Amino acid sequence: MTPVNVVTIAKPEPKRDSYGRYQITAPPKILQSGKPSKAKVKPRSYTRATTVAKTLEDTYKLNRWSQRMVAYGMGLREDLRDLAMGHNPDDSLQVFENIVDEASTAAETARAANKGTALHRFFEMADQGEALSTFPRHVQPHIKKYKQGMATKPFEIVHEHTEQVIALDDYKVAGTVDRFLQLTEPIQVCLQTGKVINLSQGDRIVGDIKTGRTLEWGWLSMTVQAAIYANHSATWNVDHGHPQGGTRGERVSSLRRDVALLIHVPAVEEDPQLELYWLDLEAGWDAFLTAM
């Protein structure tokens, strides 16, 4: 088997509207008789979990980083500096929008995100059984650390729900969960708040993979995002051959709502380390309700 063959079995993404929101069929209305209505239900737009999760996030440091990258990109491109000097920003809005975009591109601001997206897919392929030697050499250390690190923990990947689209119907929010993990033995988890949680064999938890250089700026949004995933009301099985773009499924069984595992493997590091962090989803859910 080669990576090319594996790529063909990647799960399709759900249909989206013009704002990038997932198109998902909501549950049928319940009639006074207590039975579900048989009326045809059209797909509706569900806000992405990542969008909601970032609502309360302090973006100051991220915005400053973006500004620094634009300044750096301008320093690399004489033509952009000339364009800026030759136009008035109040009268030439589109020109300056293009200058900012091109300066950001020159600074390779999307490089880390692209590498992270690719690494997510490589992890999925590795979990499907793809041999380490078939991956690009520069990502093999990342995949090795991921596989070795996860193998030492008392979890099994719930493969049928890898990259699973979920829906939180009451709030019209949806997202894609990287992994659901099932406990192979009982463990005790101590959160940063000091709260102790006992997990039983067979319990399932959300596993969220992050590949950014640092987690410093995103703890709140990551916890909210995982809380949305853990509290989902239904799964959405994407099928572009279906008239509605997919079919609804049941909530993932035995899933805990109080704790999730964050799996961090930085994509831009040549010798990465795998770090695991437990997330307090009760706090994340409270923050989600505030954001809504």
Residues covered by each model-derived region:
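Metal-dependent nuclease catalytic cores that hydrolyze phosphodiester bonds in DNA/RNA
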Residues: M1-A174, C190
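Mg2+/Mn2+-dependent nuclease catalytic core
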Residues: E160-A291
